[in-house]
């Protein structure tokens, strides 16, 4: 069964606590998440310890729970 996910997700900067919406570029559940935030691409890898996607860009660390599941289809 296939799953459909949202095209946007929330991403939080760990250093300053700011939360932004980012456009999902590529996503594979529990593997990786690639997003565009204000035309800047950020790659996040899945972290099994806290079940989140974590990545770094320009000296800042970002965290996301990933895009929301919209539904299942065959």
What are these regions (language model features)?
Residues 1-74:
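Cysteine-centric segments in proteins
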């Amino acid at each position: 069964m296939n799953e459909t996910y949202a095209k946007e997700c929330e991403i939080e900067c760990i250093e300053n606590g700011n939360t932004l919406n980012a456009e999902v570029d590529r996503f594979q559940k529990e593997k990786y998440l690639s997003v565009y935030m204000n035309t800047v691409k950020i790659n996040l890898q899945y972290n099994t310890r806290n079940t989140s996607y974590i990545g770094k860009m320009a000296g800042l660390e970002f965290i996301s729970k990933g895009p929301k599941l919209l539904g299942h289809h065959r």
